[in-house]
Amino acid sequence: MLMLLVRGTHYESLRSKVVLPTPLGGRSTEALVSECPIPDTGIRWRQSDEALRVNVGGVRRLLSARALARFPGTRLGRLQAAASEEQARRLCDDYDAAAHEFYFDRHPGFFLGLLHFYRTGHLHVLDELCVFAFGQEADYWGLGENALAACCRARYLERRLTQPRAWDEDSDTPSSVDPCPDEISDVQRELARYGAARCGRLRRRLWLTMENPGYSLPSKLFSCVSISVVLASIAAMCIHSLPEYQAREAAAAVAAVAAGRSPEGVRDDPVLRRLEYFCIAWFSFEVSSRLLLAPSTRNFFCHPLNLIDIVSVLPFYLTLLAGVALGDQGGTGGKELGHLGKVVQVFRLMRIFRVLKLARHSTGLRSLGATLKHSYREVGILLLYLAVGVSVFSGVAYTAEKEEDVGFNTIPACWWWGTVSMTTVGYGDVVPVTVAGKLAASGCILGGILVVALPITIIFNKFSHFYRRQKALEAAVRNSNHQEFEDLLSSVDAVSEASLETSRETSQEGRSADLETQAPSEPPHPQMY
């Protein structure tokens, strides 16, 4: 905390003048400060040449009026030239009229550098403060970047430009790798909803167990089981596509259709069908449990991972509903069964989305999602570059190869060749044969290397940034003292606004008392600057 202590003085006349040098170091000019707002007494509230006693976080100093008058544009210079107590109060955080004490709640370390500035006229960068905190302190005291010493200015600007936020100035995410207070407070606000809920402590503990794999040993076991079920479901879907299973199940389906029965019950291998039922039961248990334990139902349906969980089980239940609806209508003909088979195939294809469930247990996949969310500008630029390059080189290739009958018959047909060439994939299914076509292909490949590499570098840097932030956020949630937070939640409802205000005032009085107890450690007569 910073405190400016002003000793009591005799007052001067109603109007006074203070000689202030120009900020650029020119000839001194005589500036009229202000007029005293007490016309009946005709005396000024303090002498213009009186020293200021300064207390910054327990560090007390006396600042001479001559030193402050050299820099009238700074906060202390304007305070020294203040013509009334009311004007001075607007420049400080608090003022004790009895002790003539001005109070500032600022960084004491920066104030020591500020004293050096008033002595020498040059401000040096403090390594103990980050560049943004240093800049905020300098702005508060009325110092600009021009006040920086030449030896520190280049280093300050370099550190300011090399901050983590420099790579993403348009992003709305915090620049630090550490989780910001807003992210932690969002988690705490979600947990605070359990305070007034029924069985809040138990629901909160179960919700953290299911949502945070590193929360406890049971949560790690639950995560391992969930990952195993997801992998088993994906493996069953892949095995089902093997030729031997396809031939056997196709014959059984034809026989079922001929008998007027639904082919759904015979298309699956019995072992794979039982495994599918088990996976569906587990996924349904996960979704229903998370829905019941969620602190907010509305936020539950807004979370992307929860939507993925719902989509993973939705095809199975839609297939059952389609079968029941067809059975209620009495449709046993081949046309209805054929439509049902197409619907079932579409629903089966949706099972591939189950692989996205792994994102709940993978920091890398969640970081990838956050990267794509905050990289839409870079992705748009990448697609724009590709579209321009494909259009240009496809037209050139069509002009050079249209007479050769090698697949470049139309410009839209050349788009496929241009896309695989610019992305340096090069399937080789369509290749130019003329010299002009080969030159166009070479330019297309080189242009793809240069154009695609530029946005990809930015996207990769963002992925690394979000990955570190996600790891830090998980560590912060995992290492938080949950028991203390639960005790806090249990007492929130009993605290009224009046008691909160009383606690706030008591805390401020305690802080002032702590500062007063530190005062004797300072010399009784601070050094004059």
Curated annotation (Swiss-Prot):
Residues 502-514 have a biased composition (Basic and acidic residues). Residues 496-529 are annotated as: Disordered. The chain crosses the membrane at residues 218-239, 271-293, 305-322, 341-361, 377-398, 439-467. InterPro entries: BTB/POZ_dom, Ion_trans_dom, K_chnl_volt-dep_Kv, K_chnl_volt-dep_Kv5/Kv9, SKP1/BTB/POZ_sf, T1-type_BTB, VG_K_chnl, Volt_channel_dom_sf. SMART domains: BTB (SM00225). It is found in: Cell membrane. A motif (Selectivity filter) lies at residues 424-429. One of its GO terms (biological process) is action potential. Keywords: Cell membrane, Ion channel, Ion transport, Membrane, Potassium, Potassium channel, Potassium transport, Transmembrane, Transmembrane helix, Transport, Voltage-gated channel. Gene3D superfamilies: 1.10.287.70, Potassium Channel Kv1.1, Chain A (3.30.710.10), Voltage-gated potassium channels. Chain C (1.20.120.350). It holds the Pfam family Ion_trans. It comes from the Eukaryota. Residues 240-270, 323-340, 399-411, 432-438 are extracellular. Residues 412-423, 424-431 dip into the membrane without crossing it. One of its GO terms (cellular component) is nucleoplasm. It is a multi-pass membrane protein. The keyword Coiled coil does not apply. The transmembrane segment S4 functions as a voltage-sensor and is characterized by a series of positively charged amino acids at every third position. Channel opening and closing is effected by a conformation change that affects the position and orientation of the voltage-sensor paddle formed by S3 and S4 within the membrane. A transmembrane electric field that is positive inside would push the positively charged S4 segment outwards, thereby opening the pore, while a field that is negative inside would pull the S4 segment inwards and close the pore. Belongs to the potassium channel family. S (TC 1.A.1.2) subfamily. Kv9.1/KCNS1 sub-subfamily. Potassium channel regulatory subunit that modulate the delayed rectifier voltage-gated potassium channel activity of KCNB1 and KCNB2 by altering their kinetics, expression levels, and shifting the half-inactivation potential to more polarized values. While it does not form functional channels on its own, it can form functional heterotetrameric channels with KCNB1 and KCNB2. Each regulatory subunit has unique regulatory properties that can lead to extensive inhibition, significant changes in kinetics, and/or substantial shifts in the voltage dependencies of the inactivation process. This is Delayed-rectifier potassium channel regulatory subunit KCNS1. It comes from Papio anubis (Olive baboon). The lineage of its organism: Eukaryota, Metazoa, Chordata, Craniata, Vertebrata. The gene is KCNS1.
